[in-house]
From Swiss-Prot:
Belongs to the influenza viruses hemagglutinin family. Palmitoylated. In natural infection, inactive HA is matured into HA1 and HA2 outside the cell by one or more trypsin-like, arginine-specific endoprotease secreted by the bronchial epithelial cells. One identified protease that may be involved in this process is secreted in lungs by club cells. Major glycoprotein, comprises over 80% of the envelope proteins present in virus particle. The extent of infection into host organism is determined by HA. Influenza viruses bud from the apical surface of polarized epithelial cells (e.g. bronchial epithelial cells) into lumen of lungs and are therefore usually pneumotropic. The reason is that HA is cleaved by tryptase clara which is restricted to lungs. However, HAs of H5 and H7 pantropic avian viruses subtypes can be cleaved by furin and subtilisin-type enzymes, allowing the virus to grow in other organs than lungs. GO terms for biological process: clathrin-dependent endocytosis of virus by host cell; fusion of virus membrane with host endosome membrane; fusion of virus membrane with host plasma membrane; viral budding from plasma membrane; virion attachment to host cell. This is Hemagglutinin. InterPro entries: Capsid_hemagglutn, Hemagglutn_HA1_a/b_dom_sf, Hemagglutn_influenz_A, Hemagglutn_influenz_A/B. Disulfide bonds join C29-C481, C67-C292, C79-C91, C112-C154, C296-C320, C488-C492. Residues 17-529 are extracellular. Binds to sialic acid-containing receptors on the cell surface, bringing about the attachment of the virus particle to the cell. This attachment induces virion internalization either through clathrin-dependent endocytosis or through clathrin- and caveolin-independent pathway. Plays a major role in the determination of host range restriction and virulence. Class I viral fusion protein. Responsible for penetration of the virus into the cell cytoplasm by mediating the fusion of the membrane of the endocytosed virus particle with the endosomal membrane. It comes from the Viruses. It is found in: Virion membrane; Host apical cell membrane. The gene is HA. It comes from Influenza A virus (strain A/Equine/Kentucky/1/1981).
């Protein structure tokens, strides 16, 4: 009977013990910060993983206006670049202008004799890249012809006029002699000459202007020769004219000679444009020009260039992000986010990083929560936080350096005859965009994977550092927490945090407390064994008592037992 009572008391004592309720132990948990609502990013292994913070890498909107700083932006208003170069009367204001970017408006129009340029895109690109309409007149000698022809389709003020940079030559009296003119280039730069040929609408107009039934224009240099014959015939009426002028251009290198031979229909140059090599360009846009600063310009307006990618427009000028198809790419700049649970752990608010993050920790990425004789507390570990931040800082700049190539992408224009070239160019551009879009997504996924891995690694480093400090003075409780087997006040906790903890000071106390607590702190497996042993002994004692009672009753004659065979 005494044995039963002792076993019952022992079992009750085992279950009633709470080793953490005394003042001679403490609990320390390590964790990382978390936010209630994180940001989803893509990594190599996961399409969607939540992180505490992320930065958008794709610029998807413009500011709606074109900034005039740091580039000199010239508003073409009602003039195209070619009209300004030829000297259309309503574009005289642009003579001798300079620009970094010439803006052509959709409202631009020609207001002179109707013309066409067989290689319009090339001429436009050459003039645009020069960045100037600086013009130098030269003393061409045209003998036996009438100069400075004009037309009612090209009025300057109230008088008939013509393109100011061209000289329309017609008959003088009843003759149009063969013209042979040379002009050497004795300068050390390239000269751009603009000339043309007139296509009358009828044979009568041809002979009326040039005497000959068919003229011819030949322009030559040491490197090239162009011979053009007029195509006489009626064309759709434009500004009262059914004739046309075809504009051509010739570049004369230093030391070369320009030679012009013609017996009619010549629209002669008056001088040359000085060729310059630069990064100037031309762009079609209806966005307003305003006083602001932006290093990247698109037809939609200027955009910031602090992101490596943009989805605003393929056509750009300046220091611009790479164009990609994606509307969004997010670069992880924080750690993996595990929102804090409402109820957890035996200590309520104290739970380690294995279980979840801590939303209340705002002064660092990693830190400690503890419970000791002085209460509970929390503190950030600034060293591990700074180590993670140092590795993440500069990621955005590195991505920009890898992708943000400083260049300008001009518009591509092709005539109908060049349809195959246009298709090929479009295919090449689309392929480049597809390739960059894939590379961008892969690059960001790799960087995100690296960020998450390194922040996880910093958490593990802090845990291992703490474990090595505590040694046998504490036990890993799992979930990122330690049970410290000695009295550890706030100063002691602080020494663990800053790495000055000396486990030898507390070793004897910890070992003594560990043995005392381990003697009664039985884990669930041992408790089960004690329960089974206690149950078996109790049953045995009950049987012994019952058997003894029966034997005693038989001896007294109170119970009679007959055995028959």
């Amino acid at each position: 009977m005494k044995t039963t009572i002792i076993l019952i008391l022992l079992t009750h004592w085992v279950y009633s013990q709470n080793p953490t309720s005394g003042n001679n132990t403490a609990t320390l948990c390590l964790g990382h910060h978390a936010v209630a609502n994180g940001t989803l990013v893509k990594t190599i292994t996961d399409d969607q993983i939540e992180v505490t913070n992320a930065t958008e890498l794709v610029q998807s909107t413009s500011i709606g206006k074109i900034c005039n700083n740091p580039y000199r932006v010239l508003d073409g208003r009602n003039c195209t670049l070619i009209d300004a170069m030829l000297g259309d009367p309503h574009c005289d204001v642009f003579q001798y202008e300079n620009w970094d970017l010439f803006i052509e408006r959709s409202s631009a129009f020609s207001n002179c004799y109707p013309y066409d340029i067989p290689d319009y895109a090339s001429l436009r690109s050459i003039v645009a890249s020069s960045g100037t309409l600086e013009f130098t007149a030269e003393g061409f000698t045209w003998t036996g012809v009438t100069q400075n022809g004009g037309s009612g389709a090209c009025r300057r003020g109230s008088a008939d006029s013509f393109f100011s940079r061209l000289n329309w030559l017609t008959k003088s009296g009843n003759s149009y002699p063969t013209l042979n003119v040379t002009m050497p280039n004795n300068n050390n730069f390239d000269k751009l000459y603009i000339w043309g040929i007139h296509h009358p609408s009828t044979n009568n107009e041809q002979t009326k202007l040039y005497i000959q039934e068919s003229g011819r224009v030949t322009v030559s240099t040491k490197r090239s020769q162009q011979t053009i014959i007029p195509n006489i015939g009626s064309r759709p009426w434009v500004r009262g004219q059914s004739g046309r002028i075809s504009i051509y251009w010739t570049i004369v290198k230093p030391g070369d000679i320009l030679m012009i031979n013609s017996n009619g229909n010549l629209v002669a140059p008056r001088g040359y444009f000085k060729m310059r090599t630069g990064k100037s360009s031309v762009m079609r846009s209806d966005a307003p020009i305003d006083t602001c600063v932006s290093e990247c310009i698109t037809p939609n307006g200027s955009i910031p260039n602090d992101k490596p990618f943009q989805n605003v427009n393929k056509v750009t000028y300046g220091k611009c992000p790479k164009y990609i198809k994606q509307n969004t790419l997010k670069l992880a700049t924080g750690m993996r986010n595990v929102p804090e649970k409402q109820i957890r752990g035996i200590f309520g608010a104290i739970a380690g990083f294995i279980e979840n993050g801590w939303e209340g920790m705002v002064d660092g990425w990693y830190g400690f929560r503890y419970q000791n004789s002085e209460g509970t507390g929390q503190a950030a570990d600034l060293k591990s936080t700074q180590a993670a931040i140092d590795q993440i800082n500069g990621k955005l700049n590195r991505v920009i350096e890898r992708t943000n190539e400083k260049f300008h992408q001009i518009e591509k224009e092709f005539s109908e005859v060049e349809g195959r070239i246009q298709d090929l160019e479009k295919y090449v551009e689309d392929t480049k965009i597809d390739l960059w879009s894939y590379n961008a997504e892969l690059l960001v996924a790799l960087e995100n994977q690296h960020t998450i891995d390194l922040t996880d690694a910093e958490m593990n480093k802090l845990f291992e550092k703490t474990r090595r400090q505590l040694r046998e003075n504490a036990e890993d409780m799992g979930g990122g927490c330690f049970k410290i087997y000695h009295k550890c006040d706030n100063a002691c906790i602080g020494s663990i945090r800053n790495g000055t903890y000396d486990h030898y000071i507390y070793r004897d106390e910890a070992l003594n407390n560990r043995f005392q607590i381990k003697g009664v702190e039985l884990k669930s497996g041992y408790k089960d064994w004690i329960l089974w042993i206690s149950f078996a002994i109790s049953c045995f004692l009950i049987c012994v008592v019952l058997l003894g009672f029966i034997m005693w009753a038989c001896q007294k004659g109170n119970i009679r037992c007959n055995i028959c065979i």
